[in-house]
Amino acid sequence: MNAEIIAVGSELLLGQIANTNAQFLSQQLAMLGINVYFHTVVGDNAGRLEQAVKTAQTRANLIIFTGGLGPTKDDLTKETIARLLGRRLVIDEEALRAIEVYFARTNRPMTENNKKQALVLEGSTVLKNEHGMAPGMALVADGITYMLLPGPPKEMRPMFKKYGNAFLRRTFSLSERIESRVLRFFGIGESALETAIADLIDAQSNPTIAPLAGDGEVTLRLTAKHQDEAEAKRLLDEVESAILARVGRHCYGYNDETLFTKTLERLKERGWTIASAESLTGGLFLEQLTALPGASQVVQGGVVCYTNGVKEQVLGIPRPLLEAEGAVSEPCARLLAENVRAMCDADIGISFTGVAGPDPLEGHPPGTVYIGIAVRGRDATVHRLMLSGTRDAIRIRTAKYGCFFLLEMLAADC
């Protein structure tokens, strides 16, 4: 089963919005075992859309459209497909009633062109829009399955999950279970990770292993197929165990977890609090933590100690130490972590100092980083890193390494 996704909308070609619909649909189709071989983006032009459809008809037996189902003149997806397939457009009474109720409820006049949103291809299966007005539709014609979905993601995603997915399962008799699991890694590059599990990747068939690198992290998507859901999950468990036996130290979570959500979760489980002294990261570490629900149970406070004056006056770093060792040093990172922990009466103090670049500082090249971690009742530890990349990349990777080292420390305590 080969699919093509055609996104309709000039705003996509102009770069005004990103085509997140194609990403979502590709993920959903992969879980159904349907191959997506092409993504096409077409502006609001009937001629070019017709040409794109004719091309797709030569190479796909499932074509999914997003966008162009609205009330205005440039919403032309339905009209173009109707003309190509020789189908009439007819009013779906249920959709029309829903549109009328919406305008009545909001006390707004319903213009005549809004009726256009209730038009569907004759003989199609109507996909109800429970989050907007224009319904989707799906049909099979001359051996090709067509599915038309609205453009707004808040309408398209729930529609596909509830109705589009079920239509495809019925149409293509998709009884096989597709189970996926994402393993998330940090502190190891894509090439090193792939080398460590090269034989597992080479031998893959079911489950499959798909590496992906980005934002200083690496993910492995494991996908298994089986008629029985429990057996598909067992297959995933088996290959996951083999992977973690080799690179488990670097695996911090699954699926949509992040280093920050995992760190917050582990600290909450311990009942521990944290405070940060941030020079290099400028508050980025605490910004990421406090953006999460439940952060108030964990975060005591922090200091952005960007200058040596603040390090000395607020956090008590002795001037002789700053003059002798510099702010970018192990002794400074150690004392920053210890002092911010004590000042905020937290269980853990963490510090970030270093050089984000692009210029050297105190004789240190860009990417030089020190992260200090002080736990109540213990000696502080300091991690030294040499990172590469842009200024922004070094700062966010430093904050992530702070989480990674915290998770390592918490795991070792278990």
From Swiss-Prot:
Q: What highest taxon heads this organism's lineage?
A: Bacteria
S-S bridge residues: none
Q: Which SUPFAM superfamilies does its entry note?
A: CinA-like, Molybdenum cofactor biosynthesis proteins
Q: Which Pfam families match?
A: CinA, CinA_KH, MoCF_biosynth
Family from the record: Belongs to the CinA family.
Cited HAMAP family = CinA_B (MF_00226_B)
Q: Please state what the protein is called.
A: Putative competence-damage inducible protein
**Which organism encodes this protein?**
Geobacillus kaustophilus (strain HTA426)
Which gene underlies this protein? cinA
